[in-house]
Amino acid sequence: MRVRRAVAVLLSTVLAGGVVASPAGAAPRSHGDGGLPGRHSLRAPVTDENFYFVMADRFDNGDPGNDRGGLGDDPLVSGFDPTRKGFYNGGDLAGLLRRIDYIRGLGTTSIWLTPSFKNKAVQLEDGPSAGYHGYWITDFTQIDPHLGTIAELRALVDAAHARGMKVYFDIITNHTADVIGYEEGARQPYVSKDVEPYRTAAGRPFDDRDYAGRPGFPPLDPEVSFPYTPVLDPAERTLKVPAWLNDVTLYHNRGDTTFVGENSLYGDFFGLDDLFTEHPRVVRGMIDIYKTWIADFGVDGFRIDTMKHVNDEFWQRFGPEVLRFARQHGKREFFMFGEVFDTTKSFTSHFTTRDRMQAVLDFPFQEAARDFASRGEPAGQLGQFFVDDDWYTDADSNVYQLPTFLGNHDMGRIGGFVRADNPGAGDTEWVARDRLAHELMYFSRGNPVIYYGDEQGFTGPGGDQDARQTLFASRVPDYLDDDLLGTDATHAQDNFVSGHPLYRTIGDLAALTQRHPALRDGAHQHRYGDEAAGVYAFSRIDRHQQREYVVALNNSEQAKTAAVPTYVAGGAFQRVYGSGPARVTSAADRTLTVSVPPLSTVVYSSVKRIPASTAAPAVSLAAPAPAAESRGRMQVTANVAGSSFYEVTFYAQTGRSGWTPIGTDDTAPYRVFHDVAGLHAGTKVKYRAVVLDNRGHTASSRTRDARVPPPAVTIEAPAEGSNVRGTVEVRAVADPERATHVVRFERSIADGAWTTIGRDASSPAYTVFDDLAPLSLATGTQIRYRAVLAEPDGTRVTSAIRTVRYAGPPLTTATLHYYRPAGDYDGWGLHLWGDAVDPAVLAQVAWDRPWPPTRIENGWAEYDIPLVDDTQPVNFIMHLPNGDTVPTSREPGGDRSFVPIDAPQVWIVQGDPTVYTSPPPTS
């Protein structure tokens, strides 16, 4: 270990209190003795925004003259029907401009608009419903006429900029409106690449992943290249703009996605035309489209829809090129963030590390915030949640850039969640929990996003159309019966009330964080968490001010007291938010005792700076190792022998290259998850860490070596212990995934020899279909599968064995047993769907007509379900006719399912989301 003053690389400006600061993002420079500089944790320009996310059609109707988009009076042509939640309701850009100061009054610094491009007004196949939401684009160069004009957009952007606010566009690269049909019929089921590969115009099979991000993509022919033959209605051959979008070979043309595995990347979203984003023409075209909006309209950033459904190579080109263009055109703070609808940080962080995008929407935070504030889960869970923020740390991005949110237009509103999670609690508690969720969002790391209407206490019974109420007076019956939190108002009137308690709360939180910037983008250090509902506490520390803010939130319905660790011994702290003593003092052991009222938050700030360090602490590296959650990420952890505000920079070196910074962490435990997916297995990587203390001293660790592990291959299907018959899909995935992988599948019958049953080289999922029929197996025969992955460099990896059994004759009926303690089964039935269920049954089932019980026996309602394929899922919802409110008219658990070949009988119990495969206790 080397310890010295980092004079050569630190800015020699002495701040108040004698603290020496180094320049943010200082370029690393090796010293003659091999030393490496300490660096500050990255703070990109966008770590302190307050977003307001608004659906223009549902905000305010400033110009009734554009309601029908110039398409006439027929709602099935114009898409305008203010009495239906799935149609245009009348909001527009003029309404946004008229109410822009209402938005600003919340402390908003950035307005995020749902897509405003010209949409297909109505898709008759979808309900029917209209493109009011903006996600069915036909013309990427024009504003939807229902929303206004180019001139009105310019006026809105100018007005926002004049008020110090930015404007973000919601953009789409994954798909367009549903225009392409198939000769084989509309909206066909997905056909995998393993069943039918892509073919060149000459008919030669190929894997598109071999060409993604590279020149030389093979020529395609709509008659030859796809599993379905794409066709256009003659009236729509030139509907899309720019014109290249009318080339049907620039789409995947594989049928509808089920949002799982390969088809999640290649399938159509409910018929929406899925772009061939592996094709260089699509990549170039999308980059050019969005460059134009930056250059011509001065937009400040993009929210990118459906990011996880587009291949990595697209983002690796799109993000850096668009960002570079924006900065060349004067947008130094241009910022892009993507929708990755997943709550696993090892996955969501993939897009900001390997894919080089700036940020993603923080879906993991949304789930954690709901668990804490609405569901009253153990407070300590938040501690582990924030500790895992290290997944996002790399050399050019980190978690502080992520937009955080509590609900949205797809999943539903925080107001709806607190009502559903706390039935019968009453308005006072619902408002308190809603406020608590917003306090957590504003005081923790990230850029908070307010979903329009949340500031007025909007609720709604669910997501999608049920969470898209108008702020102006509604005529939609489904909205008119919604209750609002914190008010006696209804949706029958305009709701632009600046005096609403939640509007005031949000405005106050924004103002407070502006006065105390550390609460916006200071280091977020986990401090304390109760094992049950109670206090969660963390510190926010600005590296320049060096004052510690202690934030303590209580999700219990009782007052709680906690001794919160700090970096200050015997120091005074003053209250800056919440109720309690105006001034408290930390103990000699540096704990600060705070009392927090029920469902409330308090914030205290140290009066003086954190004590200045006299020397950098010792730092050492734990042995680097592949992360359990992602084999392409190497977990590198630094142990720092001290307890104060430190910033630890990690470096990596391969071969004879120089040391490269791979991220700086400013909160303990100090870690990065280095992306090594692009390196060959066995490659030696050296790591070092440099700690920078709060007075500019640095210390270096010794070097630790690691070798890049081989990829892992895992069989996904069939499920372990399942029953199979006929043709079995055997599917595997690799971690990390590379287009160069080849996977061989092997099978063993009754512990016999392993036999190869096929190979697959088509990324991203590897599949063979094993026909068992010729084997004439007896019922119960054991079958084992394994997968062997090969890389071009000779690496070979074998999966764990997957064991299944041969099933007996096909089942014709499955039975679901349902228990209600009171025996009140009248009206309760099953909404059914899926390929397992007899179509004759599905034809009888509707939302207002669920499948009824066959009998009531021994206190249970029993539902016999006729089948046509017992190997497929039976999907179900237990509810009353038209019932969609948990728990009064619908059972919890969302869309549930079971596979009859594995579970011919299942049991469910009132209020319990579990699907049991044996009778559960009912006492």
Predicted features along the sequence, with ranges:
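Carbohydrate-interacting/catalytic domains
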Residues: R2-V3, V7, G17-F53, R68-L71, ...
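Active-site clefts of carbohydrate-active enzymes
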Residues: V399-D427
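Extracellular interdomain linker/stem segments of modular secreted and single-pass surface proteins
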Residues: R707-T714, Y806-L811
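Substrate-binding/active-site clefts of carbohydrate-active enzymes
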Residues: R43-E49, D57-T292, D296-F297, F318-H329, ...
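Aromatic/hydrophobic beta-strand junction motif of beta-rich domains
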Residues: M634-G642, V730-D735, L816-R820
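Aromatic-rich carbohydrate-binding modules that target alpha-glucans
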Residues: D74, T664, A753-T767, A822-D870, ...
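Active-site-proximal helices and loops of the catalytic beta/alpha 8
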Residues: H31-G34, V157, H175, Y190-P218, ...
